Curated annotation (Swiss-Prot):
The keyword Ribosomal protein is annotated on this UniProt entry: yes
GO biological process, one term: translation
Recorded family membership: Belongs to the eukaryotic ribosomal protein eS4 family.
Alphabetically ordered keywords of this record: Ribonucleoprotein, Ribosomal protein, RNA-binding, rRNA-binding
Gene: rps4e
InterPro entries linked to this entry: Rib_uL2_dom2, Ribosomal_eS4, Ribosomal_eS4_central_region, Ribosomal_eS4_central_sf, Ribosomal_eS4_KOW, Ribosomal_eS4_N, S4_RNA-bd, S4_RNA-bd_sf
Domain called S4 RNA-binding: residue spans: 37-99
Protein name: Small ribosomal subunit protein eS4
GO cellular component, one term: cytosolic small ribosomal subunit
KW RNA-binding (keyword) present: yes
Origin species: Saccharolobus solfataricus (strain ATCC 35092 / DSM 1617 / JCM 11322 / P2) (Sulfolobus solfataricus)
Classification via SMART domains: S4
GO terms of molecular function: RNA binding; rRNA binding; structural constituent of ribosome
Length: 239
């Protein structure tokens, strides 16, 4: 199905549900339909670079739009959290950040900042010749040797260079680390991790994280909703 009704679209899409009956349906890709925005909608409704979907398509088909450092000519390409959207010809660069009101927002960044992406490890897989594959949240995979793989654990955040995927740094969810909520009712809240309540009878994914925001308020959520983005301070701009 190429389109969906606007009433069936994810609640956070910044589109008028009264203006038109249909909207673009994201293609299958690195993000689920429920947590992504079609590239044409990004260009028209979020970045305001086009007045219609047709105009947005022209911009995309001309190869002017990059997602994570690669030209994307699919107007239904799914854009999700922490993706980098670039229009170099217009000197425009954006990072998709979690937002407490609209779930996702496009934060303007510099061309230098657009060279880096932050993404969580969802699991590790052993492949041929004993090498380890790090499977990341946005669908990409990175191969490392067994010794290097010992440094990386599930739910760690990797800072990678685009589009080479070279690992530049990594961040663990630990007390005093800096994190941001990427899911749950407090999505978008960020601050210092104050406590990690590990489940005694269940796996680590049931752990509860307590975070203190910059205004001194504390929030709790499941560890699956948390992304580490720094050690004692954020490694990226989140405001």
């Amino acid at each position: 199905m190429a389109h969906i009704t606007r009433f069936e679209a994810p609640w956070f899409l910044m589109i008028s549900k009264k203006q038109y009956k249909w909207t673009v349906r994201p293609n299958a890709g690195p993000h689920s339909i429920e947590k992504s925005i079609p590239l044409a909608v990004v260009i028209r409704d979020y970045l305001k670079l086009a007045g219609t979907i047709r105009e947005a398509k022209h911009i995309i088909f001309d190869g002017k739009v990059l997602v994570d450092g690669k030209v994307r000519k699919d107007y239904k390409y799914p854009v999700g959290l922490m993706d980098i959207v670039s229009i170099p010809s217009a000197d425009l660069y954006f990072r998709v950040l979690p937002d407490n009101v609209r779930f996702m927002r496009f934060s303007k960044i510099s061309a230098d900042e657009a060279r880096y992406k932050y993404v969580r490890i969802i699991n590790k897989t052993t492949i041929k010749e004993g090498r380890i594959q790090l499977n990341l949240e946005d669908g990409r995979n990175i191969l490392v040797d067994k010794e290097t793989a010992k440094n990386f654990k599930t739910l760690m955040t990797l800072k990678i260079e685009l589009p080479s995927q070279q690992i530049l740094d990594s961040f663990t969810i630990s007390e005093r680390s800096y994190a941001i909520f990427v899911g749950g009712r407090n999505v978008g809240i960020h601050g210092i991790v104050k406590n990690i309540n590990l489940s005694k009878f269940k796996s680590r994914k049931y752990s509860v994280i307590t975070l203190e925001s910059r205004d001194g308020n504390t929030y709790q959520t499941n560890i699956m909703n948390v992304m580490s983005i720094g050690r004692e301070k954020s490694d990226l701009r989140v405001d």
